[in-house]
Amino acid sequence: MAVISMKQLLEAGVHFGHQTRRWNPKMKTYIFGARNGIYIIDLQRTVRLFHTAYQFVTQTVGSGEHVLFVGTKQQARDTIAEEAQRCGMYYINQRWLGGMLTNFKTIKLRVDRLKELDAMVEDGSINRFPKKEILQLMGEREKLEKNLGGIKNMARLPGALYVVDTQRENIAVLEANRLGIPVVAIVDTNCDPDLINYPIPGNDDAIRAIRLITSKVADACAEGRRRLEETEQADHDKEFTALEEVPAGQILKDEASGPIVEIVNPVAEAEEEQ
């Protein structure tokens, strides 16, 4: 079953590109034609390329990596936050701070400061300060939360970026390119697809189009997380079964001249005492 259908794409208006005077020639291969001065995107290409992107995202998250959702334009902000939270990923939906990837250590210091302020509010220690200073600290916390709240728990660089509007988020894309972080993105008719590892040709301005594609990318993340959990559970069960099968009193000796270790099965030992 296809992860996204032509009908869904048409209903969401994903096929509408920009005006014909605003386009990037590199997008020519993804354009079906023009109507009333508007480019029409070839949705057959969109379906195929989205399937490829979906598989990549699923595999990335399934291997233990995270995807950073990026979309700061007004039409994308709510969707980016909602869908990233739904699938347990990180997001930036207000402002991309330069160096967020390439200077991650410095950004991490600001995130640590946000956590420090959160802790002060939670335990009430912020109330020890004068009223004026409390207002300053709360203002600092609000600003940090607005810009960095979506990556508060991101301990390391993401395994991939998902971007809405690569023109607007060009700094994010270039930083990812520089670090070799794969980018999945909606590419409208005015975008440069060469900068994107997994382009999804489509309308990056309409709210319905953004929501449809972003929700499907979030579905891919959720599927990847399920696969990861299943793999981890299977590995755990395998280790537990192997431990149970070790005969009581079996002696294992390392090939090196280390100590001899006796593996004792406590269940079997208890049965013998009875």
UniProtKB/Swiss-Prot annotation:
UniProt keyword Calcium present: no
Keywords for this protein: Ribonucleoprotein, Ribosomal protein
Molecular functions (GO terms): structural constituent of ribosome
Any single GO CC term annotated in Swiss-Prot or TrEMBL for this entry: cytosolic small ribosomal subunit
SUPFAM superfamilies, A to Z: Ribosomal protein S2
Gene3D superfamilies, alphabetized: Glucose-6-phosphate isomerase like protein, domain 1, Helix hairpin bin
Keyword Ribonucleoprotein: yes
Annotated CDD domains: RPS2 (cd01425)
GO biological process: translation
InterPro entries linked to this entry: Ribosomal_uS2, Ribosomal_uS2_bac/mit/plastid, Ribosomal_uS2_CS, Ribosomal_uS2_flav_dom_sf
Classification via Pfam families: Ribosomal_S2 (PF00318)
Family of this protein: Belongs to the universal ribosomal protein uS2 family.
Protein name, UniProt field: Small ribosomal subunit protein uS2
Gene field: rpsB
